[in-house]
Regions:
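Rossmann-like adenosine-cofactor binding region
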Residues: 149-233
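NAD(P)-binding Rossmann-fold cofactor-contacting core
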Residues: 120-147
Length: 277
């Protein structure tokens, strides 16, 4: 995307007025590999009681020359994998090299994927966890034990004060993590804010951080940056697409005390890429 050879189409993401569900489409086209398609799906908060994951999606791939459908691929597992890969890439390029403590906010289906991907990027020594329903933290604790890492349930204040890297992987329409809770030098991977009104991070914290994203257009309209943009505490010009860091066009983190924030909105091209492989 950073080279201009691939682009995402505008996201559609709306409440359907039934089952408290969010439903929409993410799509795009890569001119280099001729990858064309879309992901259809959303978030059904009542699915857990039915033994289903709250996130449900299906990816459709089309032939770029004819428009014919080439494949229909289940998107639940692929979405969890690519979302974890995206935050993991942000940790690789933006977190301090000496990061030792990882803080996890959220303990749903995708949190286990996030944790397993994150530990591949830094030599973490401890995992801290916070979730609205503390009973669900047993999932993260089991993953941490499997990885040979100690796990501790903490308050948000404790998590922010200790964690060198924080991953936020939960659904919220009100800020959970505040600017006063995060120490200098922290890298925050804020994943899954992809709807107007969604918010996990206080706007003051977004404005305070050096912000990176997968796509600026999505970050300022449906992503975590929408609130700081709306209240005037930051402008879109302060946001850098992480592709520029990966390609070497941007230096990324510039100091040990800098707070970096990756606003991972999830782009259609990522879904098409993993579904095509």
């Amino acid at each position: 995307m950073s080279n201009g050879d691939a682009y995402n189409f505008p996201v559609i993401r709306e409440y359907i007025g039934y089952a408290d569900a969010l439903y929409g489409f993410k799509s795009g086209f890569d001119k280099v590999v001729l990858s064309l398609g879309l992901k259809s799906g959303g978030y059904w908060p009542g699915n857990e009681s039915k033994g289903l994951t709250n996130h449900q999606s299906t990816i459709f791939l089309f032939d770029a020359d004819s428009g014919k459908v080439k494949a229909m691929v289940g998107g639940n597992y692929l979405t969890a994998m690519r979302t974890a890969a995206s935050s993991s890439v942000s940790i690789k390029h933006l977190a301090r090299e000496d990061a030792k403590i990882l803080g996890m906010i959220g303990a749903g289906h995708q949190s286990a994927f996030q944790l397993r991907a994150a530990v591949k990027q830094r030599n973490f020594e401890r995992i801290l966890g916070w979730n609205r329903n503390s009973e669900k933290l047993s999932l993260l604790e089991a993953v941490a034990v499997d990885l040979g890492l100690p796990f501790e349930e903490v308050s948000l204040d404790e998590l922010g004060a200790q964690a060198d890297v924080i991953i936020s992987i939960t659904s919220s329409f009100a800020p959970i993590l505040k600017a006063t809770q995060v120490k200098a030098g922290t890298h925050i991977a804020c994943m899954g804010t992809d709807t107007k009104g969604k918010q996990k991070i206080e706007a003051a914290l977004v404005a305070k951080a050096t912000v990176f994203t997968d796509e600026i257009a999505q970050a300022i309209t449906i992503g975590e940056c929408q609130h700081a943009i709306a209240d005037g505490s930051m402008t879109a010009e302060r946001i850098t697409e992480i592709g520029a860091v990966i390609s070497g066009k941007h230096s990324g983190r510039t100091s040990a005390d800098e707070i970096t924030l990756f606003n991972g909105t999830g782009v259609g091209l990522q879904d098409l890429s993993v579904a095509s492989d």
